[in-house]
């Protein structure tokens, strides 16, 4: 019995080794799981379910194969792929979740999220996030021709890269008070998230009790997953 969590794969055709590693993960490790949760940024960018990118179709087929084998797959949007919609969910068999979700995992309550909402010290990013998550802005963007959406997405990624290069690492990490507030709000002692690309298990105190924040790593030179069993919560790095 095990439930698996992954995040921040940033899949793109320019990184075939990561794509191949994910396909192997779906065919091997994930097949033994009770469920797979993808906590955002599965793709490097997403400009709409109508994008005919062959990679998207390949991933949908692979995830659907996992689901059809009896392993449900759940997805929380990330900051790169927040426009993944019902069409791709239907094609892949993934179940879309809200940005925060509490799971009962073998008697252990665990809060899961992508993690960008915890980075409240980065005021510039949070303001940008509020704009692009406006439903009207998203509807307008999705009405644009694909070639215009691609240009906008490329400019946004370039702007984000430039902005992040001038920010301190502390600003781009989670805010400790925000973490505690979220865990207290949801009444949990466990939190699993991605986004920061800083894999670690952090010990803290929530409601005057020991608590744990488990951060998934990004998939670059190796894969990263959290494995939850009835007896343990493990952060695991593995070769791609």
Curated annotation (Swiss-Prot):
UniProt: Mn(2+) 2 binding residues: 41, 79, 114, 195
Subcellular location, principal: membrane
Cofactor mode of binding and number, as noted: Binds 2 Mn(2+) ions per subunit in a binuclear metal center.
This protein's record includes keyword Zinc-finger: no
Cellular localisation: Cell inner membrane
KW Zinc (keyword) present: no
Recorded superkingdom: Bacteria
GO molecular-function terms, A-Z: manganese ion binding; UDP-2,3-diacylglucosamine hydrolase activity
Catalysis: reaction(s): UDP-2-N,3-O-bis[(3R)-3-hydroxytetradecanoyl]-alpha-D-glucosamine + H2O = 2-N,3-O-bis[(3R)-3-hydroxytetradecanoyl]-alpha-D-glucosaminyl 1-phosphate + UMP + 2 H(+)
Disulfide bridge positions per record: none
Annotated positions binding Mn(2+) 1: 8, 10, 41, 197
Gene Ontology cellular-component annotations: cytoplasm; extrinsic component of plasma membrane
Pathway connected to this protein: Glycolipid biosynthesis; lipid IV(A) biosynthesis; lipid IV(A) from (3R)-3-hydroxytetradecanoyl-[acyl-carrier-protein] and UDP-N-acetyl-alpha-D-glucosamine: step 4/6
Protein's name according to its UniProt entry: UDP-2,3-diacylglucosamine hydrolase
């Amino acid at each position: 019995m095990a439930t698996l969590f992954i995040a921040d794969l940033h899949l793109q055709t320019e990184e075939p080794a990561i794509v191949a590693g994910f396909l192997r993960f779906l065919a091997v490790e994930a097949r033994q799981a009770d469920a797979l949760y993808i906590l955002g940024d599965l793709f490097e960018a997403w400009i709409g379910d109508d994008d005919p990118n062959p990679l998207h179709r390949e991933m949908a087929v692979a995830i659907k194969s996992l689901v059809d084998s009896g392993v449900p797959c759940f997805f929380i949007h990330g900051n790169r792929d927040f426009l993944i919609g019902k069409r791709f969910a239907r094609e892949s068999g993934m179940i879309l979740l809200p940005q925060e979700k509490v799971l009962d995992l073998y008697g252990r309550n665990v809060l899961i999220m992508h993690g960008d909402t915890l980075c409240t010290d980065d005021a510039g990013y949070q303001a940008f996030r509020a704009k692009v998550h406006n439903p009207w802005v998203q509807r307008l963007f999705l009405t644009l021709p694909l070639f215009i959406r691609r240009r906008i997405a490329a400019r946004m990624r370039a702007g984000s890269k430039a902005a992040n290069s001038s920010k301190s690492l502390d600003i781009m990490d989670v805010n400790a008070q925000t973490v505690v507030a979220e865990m207290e709000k949801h009444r949990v002692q466990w939190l699993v998230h991605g986004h920061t690309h800083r894999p670690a298990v952090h010990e803290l105190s929530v409601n005057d009790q020991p608590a744990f924040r488990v951060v998934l790593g990004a998939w670059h030179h190796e894969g990263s997953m959290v494995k939850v069993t009835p007896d343990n919560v493990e952060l695991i790095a593995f070769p791609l």
